[in-house]
């Protein structure tokens, strides 16, 4: 599929809302829009990846379709959206089986998959289908409206000051991209690290911002006013501690914005003060190979780039003879009594939490808000 470019001019004096990578978290989208009092006077841009990696992909698609009908909304296609469409429109039984196998695995990660949801509405269990070609043909017929909506999502949205694209663009000569394949613009891993700069702001999703955090383990948007790049993806659905990031600009001409976030993590209230640590390490995907120093039942001792760290034992795992650790830090957060923290997990080390988009440890007493 070739790149589809949409050009619009935003009217003056209307709020511009933007988020990306909803990944089937319809509840999060719904709560965020309610929280910010989203109205027909606003403009919403959704920078790709509506489906998968969350519990309500089908509801998310239908919600966005309805928002497009009732409000001013500009959704873009993401790489996961495209891949799912390619699989659903394939007549190859091997592709069908691969999607079914993925769905079985996805139940352990996110409760279900996009394919599971589609089949559930029709009363099927994907792996019980004797004729996958017939099954997928029936899905295409029953969900023709939803699939058509996804198929026609643009790749790039250009406005007066901003260019929105799920993965990234190599330059701002957008007409040159019209005849190119769209997938490289949707799946541009570590786009921000490639050193590009632009005249207009380029707003992307796809790559969780925490993967750019060489120091502070931050999940909030990355905004670079020098290079004119905004990275929105808070890792929702990809990481247990991920979040949906919603940026709001009061007007298309404004440089100032406000951030609203959503996460499904439970909330606790801190009862004690705690000072932040100044010396800490952060292990993240892509830089998560470690040396196992001591294996315990609750806690394990590991080494990451020569620095020893004690972590919850369940964070350490092996694959192909190598040892890895899930995203973790030994950062101790600055906390005051009354602070609301999002609880990721607990261990003998304390409570592993997120505060203002930053993950770390809180070792004091707390009250559960459940």
Show which residues each predicted segment covers.
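Active-site neighborhood of divalent metal-dependent phosphoester bond hydrolases
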Residues: 60-154
């Amino acid at each position: 599929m070739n790149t589809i470019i949409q050009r619009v001019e935003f009217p003056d004096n209307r709020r511009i809302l933007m988020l990306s990578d909803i990944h089937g978290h319809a509840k999060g989208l719904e709560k965020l829009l309610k929280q910010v009092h989203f109205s027909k006077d606003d403009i919403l841009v959704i920078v790709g990846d509506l489906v998968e990696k969350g519990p309500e992909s089908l509801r998310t698609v239908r919600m966005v379709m309805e928002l497009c009908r009732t409000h001013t909304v500009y959704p873009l296609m993401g790489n996961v959206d495209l891949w799912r469409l390619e699989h659903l429109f394939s007549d190859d039984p091997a592709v069908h089986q691969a999607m079914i196998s993925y769905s079985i695995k996805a139940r352990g990660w996110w409760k279900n998959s996009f394919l599971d949801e589609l089949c559930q509405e029709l009363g099927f269990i994907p792996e019980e289908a004797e004729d996958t070609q017939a099954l997928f043909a029936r899905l295409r017929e029953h969900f023709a409206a939803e699939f058509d909506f996804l198929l026609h999502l643009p790749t790039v949205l250009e406005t007066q000051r901003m260019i929105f694209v799920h993965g990234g663009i190599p330059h701002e000569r957008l007409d040159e991209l019209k005849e190119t394949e769209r997938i490289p613009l949707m799946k541009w891993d570590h786009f921000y690290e490639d050193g590009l700069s632009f005249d207009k702001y380029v707003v992307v999703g796809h790559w969780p911002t925490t993967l750019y955090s060489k120091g502070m383990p931050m999940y909030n948007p990355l905004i670079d006013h020098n290079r004119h790049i905004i990275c929105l993806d808070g890792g929702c659905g990809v990481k247990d501690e991920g979040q949906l990031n919603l940026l709001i600009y009061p007007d298309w001409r404004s440089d100032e914005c406000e951030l609203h976030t959503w996460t499904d993590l439970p909330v606790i209230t801190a009862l004690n003060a705690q000072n932040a640590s100044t010396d800490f390490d952060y292990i993240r995907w892509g830089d998560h190979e470690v040396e196992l120093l001591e294996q315990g039942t609750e806690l394990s001792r590991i080494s990451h780039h020569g620095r020893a760290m004690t972590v919850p034992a369940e964070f350490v795992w092996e694959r192909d003879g190598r040892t890895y650790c899930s995203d973790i830090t030994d950062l101790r957060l600055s906390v005051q009594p009354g602070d609301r923290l999002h609880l990721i997990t607990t261990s003998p080390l304390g409570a592993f939490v997120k505060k203002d988009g930053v993950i770390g440890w809180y070792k004091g007493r707390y009250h559960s808000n459940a």
